[in-house]
């Protein structure tokens, strides 16, 4: 499956906000001007149409969670079939991805690194190795680093970074055992206010 491997800063500049694609100290900073779009001359972004706003919001969320278009549309379709708010359902499906849960627990410094840990079979769910980043974690599931992978330096560094930025309330982590419990699916109020999921619903509803 194709994935973007270019400069992460360029994606954050395109969306005009930090997408948290880099680990802690290397996140979007003064050297990466978010008010300017990528390009040789770094032009300031102009006013967007309603469609443009909807498209940019969809791209922003897609890039935050590292999901390609076809899979993202599949999440939207699943969200629309569920009871309740389609936008909230969409964000919850993305939050329940195993690679995202690994990131939220602090085992990976970024979602991309967390996805790699999953793909390389360094993660277990309820004692069973799972190497599918899109695996949907359920409330009560126990996610852990496999014993032979627990001494990796990058995991120790990621846990330190997570301690600095703060861990979310819907996961509980045992730092000594390098295990975590996904306590519950987060409510919309628990998630970033910087995301306007209604714009995404409007885009796909056309």
UniProtKB/Swiss-Prot annotation:
One Pfam family here: Ribosomal_S4
Gene Ontology molecular function, alphabetical: rRNA binding; structural constituent of ribosome
CC annotations in GO: small ribosomal subunit
Keyword Ribonucleoprotein annotated: yes
Residue ranges constituting the S4 RNA-binding domain according to the UniProt record: 96-156
Superkingdom of the source species: Bacteria
SMART domains: Ribosomal_S4, S4
Classification via PROSITE patterns: RIBOSOMAL_S4 (PS00632), S4 (PS50889)
Sorted UniProt keywords: Ribonucleoprotein, Ribosomal protein, RNA-binding, rRNA-binding
NCBIfam families: PRK05327.1 (NF003717), rpsD_bact (TIGR01017)
Free-text function comment from the UniProt entry: One of the primary rRNA binding proteins, it binds directly to 16S rRNA where it nucleates assembly of the body of the 30S subunit. With S5 and S12 plays an important role in translational accuracy.
Subunit structure: Part of the 30S ribosomal subunit. Contacts protein S5. The interaction surface between S4 and S5 is involved in control of translational fidelity.
Similarity annotation: Belongs to the universal ribosomal protein uS4 family.
Protein name per Swiss-Prot or TrEMBL: Small ribosomal subunit protein uS4
Organism: Pseudomonas paraeruginosa (strain DSM 24068 / PA7) (Pseudomonas aeruginosa (strain PA7))
